[in-house]
Amino acid sequence: MKILFLIFHGFDPNNGISKKISYQLNAFKANGHETHLCYMDESSSKRRIVDGMVIADYGNGKKGKILKRTEFGSIVDYAIKNKIDFVYIRSNHNANPFTIRMIRRMKKVGMKVVMEIPTYPYDQEYFDKWMKRQLIQDKIFRNLLAKQLDAIVTFSEYNTIFGQRTIRISNGIDFDSVRMKKNSNHPANELHMIGVAEIHHWHGFDRVIEGLARYYAIQREIKVYFHVVGYFFSPIEEEEITRIIQENNLESYVILHGKKHGNELDDIFDQCDFGIGSFGRHRVGIEHIKTLKNREYAAKGIPFAYSETDTDFDNKPYVLKMPADETPINIETIIEFYKKQTETPMEIRNSIQDLSWKNQMKRVIDSVFPSKN
């Protein structure tokens, strides 16, 4: 079977979202399917590309900005010419008459089409005026767009989204790309926590740092450190985090590494004992979510904590659930939980073998093409 994986943005192999897309592409291929990636490149002019081949060049200026959001005929033409059977679209919250027409044309010639919505619900992620204007258009057309699809792929527990049936999967793991952590070699009276993300307010890292401020309000025998890895999404998050650090003199205990990947990221993980997931999903109205980060922590072989509902991990012995509210994270609770851990990194990693990307993407194929099972 021939699959076209369609995204409406750029593709950078070092970017976290692009890495996930690479894993999904490889998973389709591992299941025996010929798979092609269509993405936008804006390095010189605005160009739509499939596997390195330019299928549309929109130029620059206002015309290019408009065409990249409205011209999808080149995608359909490519799909027809190359006899694509299945189109897997990653949503960019861009439901409009042009995306609807694209899907209708694909369906008319017999292609199966699904759309992945990475995070749902997502309306509360739109907080400034420009973003809210973009959301208005999506709200107007998304139910009609969903009606054209064969299904919506979700990492939530919703059976339907925008009136369309869902295929519920988990964020997966590409085990070949995630090295298990090595043993930490820091002093026994230290606990090193790590949080890896493009840092948004819904990650709730401020709650962890507020918790450290309370923890260090008195003299402590156990020294707890928080390694924050990743860029801040906006100055708002960065200013909030740095303010809490400075006001509480936590510069020695909260280490802002910036964005790291590859061996540099592996080296930081090797220093760390405990993973920090999301502690602020309630801020954007999300209760159920299966984040990629939780799975990466497990693949690394470290225990971790989060505050949402993740049915793949909620009952695991190496997972600590925290309240989904605005209270500072209780650092002593983390210390006591960590002291009781008996699972080895290998045991933690082996517990999620069923969450490979190959298995997750096979579930999509089996749902869309049941006769091929």
At which residue positions do the language-model features occur?
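N-terminal subdomain of nucleotide-sugar transferases
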Residues: 1-43, 82
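Conserved donor-binding/catalytic core segment of Leloir-type glycosyltransferases
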Residues: 4, 185-203, 209-212, 226-227
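Nucleotide-sugar-dependent
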Residues: 15, 94, 203, 263-268, ...
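A charged, aromatic-enriched C-terminal amphipathic alpha-helix characteristic of glycosyltransferases
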Residues: 16, 325-329, 336-371
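Membrane-proximal helix-turn-helix segments that form the acceptor-binding/catalytic region
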Residues: 26, 73, 97, 101-109, ...
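Donor nucleotide-sugar binding/catalytic pocket of nucleotide-sugar-dependent glycosyltransferases
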Residues: 139-181
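Glycosyltransferase donor-sugar binding loop
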Residues: 225-240, 258
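Nucleotide-activated donor-binding/catalytic signature segment of Leloir-type glycosyltransferases, i.e.
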Residues: 238-267
